[in-house]
């Protein structure tokens, strides 16, 4: 197959949802339809507690939330699909944000009993920044749901995106009978398939087919016809251009738990979602059809293999083809490296990649030299942009139970901060270590991982820090004066960038007024 054909068949997407809308279940079922795992949700761990194949860190298994982004590749129709799983828990916005910079489309999962929830709103704001195309799956139709028309109205008014229903539900809860496909004029009858059983679906052609009345009952069939008249009059038709521009979302109904409807949106994804897209770099735009290799690191994951203390850098291939043993330029440090052991991911199973194309995600073994946002090329000096670091909103001082382990603590914290799990600040005025996070859960994750991965027992104490800003100043003399007078409030972050840690917002505002030549940044490009 030629290079352009390989690129054209790639689809790289992420699933976004509010916690508990059923994202992990959908991830499993998607893999099931892609034949990537045999028994969804029953991948047995030690002991017999079952856990999904994509939730693979210890704490995730205990809490049932996906904390780290996993990558899964599977074939579907004539495409090769890369699914990036994003943390569903509300705390992990940074990691999720960075993952969304590496995909070309998203599937938004909505719990049809609840409708649009706040986390969904936040994630949609992020996809807006790059006008990412969105597909929507209304999940949990085997339960009692809200009125489907109401759900569409809510998505349109709250998320400011037009809805084009592709399938329409027939009943819900105990009366859920299936869905009607508006563009194929077919009804798919629902039979619950649990676990890894994908039921043969009975298809009834045509809306006026008497078999439909016989199968779902005359009342529901009549209700369906009336609803569809309303839907076709009141809602948008699917429009490929508006979808690609992020202005319209095709909507599918189903139940992931009952293995029903998942294949409908996968058909939509492979048919309509964009192939790997061009990306902005600091000097030019890089097209996916270019034959020279380029890629950027959007995430670093420590200790994916508990047996080896390794760290893997996840890289999105933007253009060209990776081949085992090729020489690439690590642009930030200006060094050429030979990459012979890149990984690909089949749902948590790591295999060595012989090759990878634009749109694929590969894993690079990282011994501390790779950072989030790093660009790799075949020699060209360019840096992909748009992978931000956010100023944390919560701070704690971290302290050791055993003071002799200071070195391990620092090493662990720096590694975790490079990975983007947390940010670490070392004040210039004392030997404290301050940890900054976007959400409370991140603090628990750090202590748990320090213990299991670095054998360090640490505890938190409150610290008088309200917020942090990265500081820069073009005037060297004024900057020196600023540093001299504010040493008490200055720290270095994990990447040795100078940071102002403010005890109160008032203090920050006063400092900004007092030093107009110093710029205080809330986000920083990686």
Curated annotation (Swiss-Prot):
GO biological process: regulation of translational termination
GO CC, any one term: cytosol
SUPFAM superfamilies: EF-G C-terminal domain-like, P-loop containing nucleoside triphosphate hydrolases, Translation proteins
Principal location listed in the UniProt entry: cytoplasm
Compartmental location: Cytoplasm
The keyword Flavoprotein is annotated on this UniProt entry: no
Domain tr-type G: 8-277
Positions of GTP binding: 17-24, 85-89, 139-142
GO MF annotation, one: GTPase activity
PROSITE patterns: G_TR_1, G_TR_2
Primary role: Increases the formation of ribosomal termination complexes and stimulates activities of RF-1 and RF-2. It binds guanine nucleotides and has strong preference for UGA stop codons. It may interact directly with the ribosome. The stimulation of RF-1 and RF-2 is significantly reduced by GTP and GDP, but not by GMP.
Family: Belongs to the TRAFAC class translation factor GTPase superfamily. Classic translation factor GTPase family. PrfC subfamily.
Protein's name according to its UniProt entry: Peptide chain release factor 3
Organism the protein comes from: Actinobacillus succinogenes (strain ATCC 55618 / DSM 22257 / CCUG 43843 / 130Z)
Taxonomic lineage of the native organism: Bacteria, Pseudomonadati, Pseudomonadota, Gammaproteobacteria, Pasteurellales
